[in-house]
Amino acid sequence: MAVATSTRSRVRAVSDRNEIATFLRTDRLYAAYALGDLDGPGRARVAWGMSYDETGSPTALVMHHEGLVPQPLFLMGAPHGCRAILEHVLKPRDAYLQGTELHGEAIADLYELDAPVTMLRMVVDRAAFAPFAGPAERLTALDTDDLNRLYQLGFRGGFPPSVLEEGIYYGVRVRGRLVSAAGTHAINRREGIAVVGNVMTHADFRGHDFAKMVTSAVTAELLAHVADVALNVHADNEPAVAAYARLGYRTHCELVERLARRRSGGWGLMRPIREAMRIPWQREPK
C-alpha cells in the first residue's frame, strides 16, 4: 500500500478494524457517528485514512462515507494530520465535513468551506438517563409513508422501509396522524454506542413535549443494549438543548459541520454548472 510522507505526518489508507476502532475509542463520544459506521450496513462504502508521527503512533483519522449525499467527512485528531490525509490519501470532491474549527482551518487551502454550523454533541448513559413518559409508539416499516410525510422528504427522496427495520424509531400520533418522531443514525452494539437523530415535531403540534417523549423512548430502548447514547443539536437551539438535558443528556463537546468543496482541479471550475444542476437537499432535522 502506498504511503505518503510529509515533514510532519506519515499517512496511509487503513482498513484494519482493530486499528481504526482503537483510535476512535480514544474519544468514543466524539467519534460516535464514526463508530456507528465502522460496523454499519454501509461500511463497504466507508474509506479510512490515518496519520502517524515519527514513532509510528497514530495522530489523526479521517473517515469518508461514499454512500450518502452529501458524503460525510469526519475528522479526528491532530489537524495537520487530517490535512495530510486529505492531501495524499482521501480526496473527496464535495463532502459534508464534521470536525472542529481547528480542522476547518487546517484544510482551508484544500477545500472551499461554507459557513460553519456549530453543534453540541450531547451524551447520556444509563446512570444519568431520566426518562420522560408519554404516548410514544414504536414505528415499523408499515409507518414509512407516514414518517416521510412528517419529514416532508417525498417518495423519491424519502427513507426506505429498511431504515425503520434496521433502526429504532418512535412516534406520537394525534387522531391517527404522525406528528412527532425520533430515530437512530447508528447503532453499534459491539462498541456499546448509538446515535439518536431525525428528531422532528410538526410545526402545528409543538409545545406539547412530543419531541421529548419520542427522544426518551428511543434513548430508553437503546440504553437496554448499549452503554452510551449520543446526539447532535444546534448550539443555538436552547429549547432543544434544555429538553435533552432534562432527559439526562450532557454536553460532551462542541463541533462544526459544513459543506466542503475541493479547490484543486477542473472540478472547482465546474462549480457554477454543478450548482445549477444540484438537487435541493434538506438538512435532516436536529
Model-predicted regions and their roles:
Residues 2, 6-11, 22-88, 182-197:
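Conserved donor-binding loop and adjoining core beta-sheet/short helix segment
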Residues 2-33, 119-121, 125-158, 272-286:
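Short amphipathic alpha-helix that is part of the acyltransferase structural core
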Residues 48, 54-133, 258:
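Acyl-donor-binding surface of acyltransferase catalytic domains
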Residues 65, 158-200:
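A conserved beta-strand-loop-helix scaffold within acyl/acetyltransferase catalytic domains
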Residues 79-89, 201, 207-223, 241-246:
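Conserved acetyl-CoA-binding loop-helix of GNAT-fold acetyltransferases
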Residues 98-104, 221-222, 231-241, 257-269:
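Conserved beta-strand-loop-alpha-helix junction that forms the acyl-donor binding cleft
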Residues 102-115, 212, 235-253:
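Conserved active-site alpha-helix within GNAT-family acetyltransferase domains
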Residues 240-242, 246-286:
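…primarily DNA-binding HTH/wHTH and HhH modules…
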